[in-house]
A protein has these predicted regions:
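Positively charged n-region of N-terminal signal peptides that target proteins for export
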Residues: 1-4
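Hydrophobic h-region of N-terminal signal peptides that target proteins for export
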Residues: 8-17
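Primary mode marks residue(s) on the alpha4-beta5-alpha5 output face of response regulator receiver
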Residues: 18-183
Length: 183
């Protein structure tokens, strides 16, 4: 039993180290970004790297042939959270992160098939994994009125980017516990 426990702890430690290691090289960033979306989105998607300064230029890592753009983990974040974005969501996100009010004329969609980490109240520091999800932005914030605001219950919920008020809808499509149980 002691030997089994040692093996399990070693495997768990190795998994924790590998899953929290953020991509560094361009090849790692491309691979990380492409796992954010389903294959029909990511296989032909453009891959960008995050700007080196807020509001700066995104760096092209790979030119794609469809309208989707995928980005790797955000530098400086404590977790690996790659995403794939349609042109509307990408524009909305780039404007929001640069401190500009986004102006979009239709719904935008994003995939985060690797999931994301959230704190329940936005400030407690207690984080949990949201699991794979789709996000939707709308030109009309009223579209999100009445939606759940609790990201911990597995239901669709509304959220906003740090230091911003523009809302987006997060729709988990698989519970994290279910995903771990099947691996």
């Amino acid at each position: 039993m002691k030997q089994l426990t040692t093996v399990l702890l070693t495997v768990a430690a190795a998994f924790a180290q590998s899953s929290d290691r953020l991509p560094v090289t361009d090849a790692e960033k491309i691979a990380d970004a492409l796992r954010a979306g389903p294959a029909f989105v990511s296989k032909d998607a453009t891959v960008l790297d995050w700007p080196s300064v807020p509001g700066g230029e995104y760096r092209l890592l790979r030119k794609g042939s469809n309208e989707w753009t995928c980005l790797p983990a955000i530098p400086g974040y404590s977790h690996d959270e790659p995403g794939c974005f349609d042109p509307i969501f990408l524009h909305w996100m780039q404007d929001s992160l640069a401190g500009r009010t986004p102006h979009i004329d239709r719904i935008g969609i994003s995939y985060m098939c690797f999931g994301a980490w959230q704190s329940k109240d936005g400030s407690s520091g207690h984080e949990f994994h949201v699991g794979p999800h789709v996000m939707i932005v709308s030109p009309t914030q009223d579209d999100f009125q009445g939606f759940n605001r609790d990201p911990s219950n597995g239901m669709p919920y509304v959220a906003h980017l740090p230091h911003r008020t523009e809302l987006y809808l997060v729709m988990p499509f698989r519970q994290w516990d279910e995903e771990q149980a099947h691996e």
